[in-house]
A protein has these predicted regions:
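Catalytic cores of NTP-dependent nucleotidyl/adenyl transfer enzymes across multiple folds
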Residues: 82, 198-266
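Hydrophobic helix segments
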Residues: 20-23
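Active-site nucleotide-donor binding segment shared across nucleotidyl transfer reactions
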Residues: 113-155
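Short amphipathic alpha-helices in soluble, non-transmembrane regions
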Residues: 157-164
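Helical scaffold of the NTase/Pol beta-like nucleotidyltransferase catalytic core
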Residues: 57-126, 247
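Low-complexity, glycine/proline/serine-enriched flexible coil segments
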Residues: 1-4
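Conserved catalytic core of two-metal-ion nucleotidyltransferases
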Residues: 166-198
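Residues flanking N-terminal targeting/processing segments that define the start of mature chains
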Residues: 10-17
Length: 266
């Protein structure tokens, strides 16, 4: 979920040097992102590269889009880095399916496993993402958010998550991400975050608002359908294509939270 404002962003080339704007699409995109924050997405970078060639963003060759995404990701997600011990999974097209009544059961099974392995290190274990919202179409992957007291103390939670059969794939300033290793079904993702941080709050608020707002659910479902149509073979772009709708829903959710007294339970 792209919600950072990326303040203080530096526009750098692949050699690590700050570049001017001018006609360089990447530098222009960086300046746009620095001014306007997360509403300037990877799709705009694709557009800046594609337009002079008479192409639509989704018409850029996939290999070129992947290079652009790899260059932009550290700027969109400060602190981003892959765990050098992890192995990349084979790239698969985005698949969005109808809501499955079995997703909550899958979450509960994984929750029990994580509780047993993490013990008191896990201050909160929550089902988040689209599979946590009854009736909402989703990628068939259960997202689990684990809140801890100290995100930087990886030795306390990385080994237990790995013992659950997950690999520690990447980190950024806000969370740590675990997924099944290559060769295993991709049916669960675990996101470890700092208790009380914005990452924790935003994902729980987004979930709870979608659960109670049919209009927000339909808007999000429509965004998913369109993103899949255009970007089904490009996972970073699929995620980024939903940004405007997500930020709009979060604005509504913020007003709803203020009106209802919503807060993180417990």
């Amino acid at each position: 979920m792209a919600t950072d404002d990326s303040s203080g962003l530096e526009c750098v080339d692949q050699g690590g040097h700050r570049g001017p704007g001018g006609d360089d699409p990447f530098a222009v995109w960086c300046e746009m992102r620095e001014r306007e924050g997360a509403r300037v997405t990877l799709i705009q970078l694709y557009a800046l590269v594609a337009k002079p060639r008479g192409l639509e963003p989704h018409e850029l060759p996939l290999a070129e889009r992947r290079e652009l995404a790899a260059r932009a990701t550290p700027l969109m997600w400060p602190g981003f880095e892959y765990n050098e011990r992890s192995k990349p999974r084979e790239r698969q097209p985005v698949e969005v399916v109808a809501y499955d009544q079995g997703w909550p059961e899958r979450f509960e099974a994984w929750r029990g496993r994580l509780v047993g392995l993490l013990g008191p290190v896990a201050l909160r274990i929550e089902h988040v993402g689209s599979t946590s919202v009854p009736g909402l179409a989703a990628k068939p992957v259960v997202d689990i958010q684990v809140s801890v007291a100290n995100l930087g103390d990886e030795d306390r939670y990385v080994p237990p998550c790995e013992a659950a059969g997950l690999q520690f794939r990447l980190r950024d300033d806000e969370h740590r991400y675990f997924q099944p290793p290559p060769g295993k079904p991709r049916h669960v993702h675990v996101h470890v975050c700092q208790q009380g941080a914005e990452w924790e709050r935003v994902h729980l608020l987004f979930r709870d608002y979608l659960r109670c707002s049919a209009g927000a659910r339909e808007a999000y479902a429509a965004a998913k359908r369109e993103a899949t149509r255009l970007w089904g073979n490009d996972r970073p772009a699929y995620t980024e294509a939903k940004t405007d709708v997500i930020l709009g829903i979060l604005d509504q959710a913020g007003a709803w939270a203020a009106a209802t007294g919503w807060g993180i339970r417990g």
